[in-house]
Every structure is written in C-alpha cells, then in structure tokens.
Amino acid sequence: MKQNNIYLVGFMGSGKTSILKKIKQIVNANTIDLDENIEKKYGSINKIFQTKGEKYFRNIELETFQALPDNDTVIALGGGSLEVSHILDEVKNSELSFYLKDTFENLWKRIANSERPLVKKGKEEISELYKLRENLYNQSKHIIDIKNKKEKIIAETIIQNTWLKNEVI
C-alpha cells in the first residue's frame, strides 16, 4: 500500500487538477496528476478512448498508478480511476483521500462544452455515470463540498487536514 499519499478524487470538472496546482503553489508539495502522467506516456486520453476503448485505458491507468511514488505525494486521480478496484482499495484504505464534491448540474456546466471523451454521450448518460461514481467517491475519508468555494479555500482545507493534523510531510 502507498503510505501517506494524498488523493484527490471527484467527477469530471470537480477541479482536481486545479486544486492540485494550488496545493503545490501554497506548500510546494510533490504533486502528480494521473491523467497528465498517462498522456505523457501514451498520448491523448481522448485518442486512447477512441482507438483502444475504455477497458484498455483503465488497464494503463492502473499500470500508471502502480508506478507512482509510494509516499508523500499529492495525487489527482482521474474521474473514473476509482472504477479500477486496486485504485479504489488504495483510496479507501488511505486516511488522506479527499472527494471534491459538487452537484451534477454545476459539474455539467463546467464540462458540457469540453473535449472529454465521455461528455459526447450526453447529459442524461453522464448524469447516470455521476450517480454510479458518486458511490465510489463517497468511500474517501474526507468529503469536501466545493460548491461555490474558491480553489484556494479548498486547497487550504486539504492542507489543514493533512500537514497540520496528521503531520504527513
């Protein structure tokens, strides 16, 4: 098990990457965006979905996750990462997992016009996906309601619940 890593989880558009960058800016932490790591090694996630499918993507997502550092890193997971059982187990067993929670309507406003591969399925299907994934996200140790909150406040909340209380890094 990866010790003392901090996991940011949430649906597409929840701001995982933005919050990750804000945390790095505030405390100069080691940070990794899982999707960015995948794109560096394998190319565009959109293209992977289009040419090889979601199952192939989830396999390389797991492979990339397993290659991550074992400790003291803030990691933004992909929106569907918790569908991979090994990744879900790591997050469930971590005291430092944070679900960035928002309403589907707010998230849809942020992603509706994006190039994300799953968005092409339409609002109704994505709403169903959100409901399914929400059960996975809710297994995080900490749930942060991000509705109408600034990125800096969200990042500071995560920092206060890790560095100060648990003295992780």
For each predicted feature, which ranges?
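A glycine- and Lys/Arg-enriched "phosphate-lid" helix/loop adjacent to the NTP-binding pocket
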Residues: 94-135
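ATP-dependent small-molecule kinase phosphotransfer cores
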Residues: 36-89
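Short glycine-rich anion-binding loops that position phosphate/pyrophosphate groups of nucleotides
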Residues: 78-82, 103-105, 149
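Hydrophobic anchor at the beta1->P-loop junction of P-loop NTPases
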Residues: 8
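P-loop (Walker A) phosphate-binding loop of NTP-binding proteins
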Residues: 11
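NTP-dependent small-molecule kinase module
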Residues: 1-3, 18, 22, 26, ...
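Conserved glycine(s) of the Walker
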Residues: 15
